[in-house]
UniProtKB/Swiss-Prot annotation:
Keywords: Antibiotic resistance, Leader peptide. It comes from the Bacteria. This is Erythromycin resistance leader peptide. GO terms for biological process: response to antibiotic. Residues 1-24 are annotated as: Disordered. This peptide is involved in the control mechanism of the synthesis of the macrolide-lincosamide-streptogramin B resistance protein. The keyword Ribonucleoprotein does not apply. The lineage of its organism: Bacteria, Bacillati, Actinomycetota, Actinomycetes, Kitasatosporales. Residues 15-24 have a biased composition (Pro residues).
Length: 24
């Protein structure tokens, strides 16, 4: 399982880029 998670992009990648302001 660890291998599968490692293969996937980091949690940060899932979230929108910092450039895009959060839907406030």
């Amino acid at each position: 399982m660890s291998m599968g998670i490692a293969a996937r992009p980091p949690r940060a990648a899932l979230l929108p880029p910092p450039s895009v302001p959060r839907s406030r």
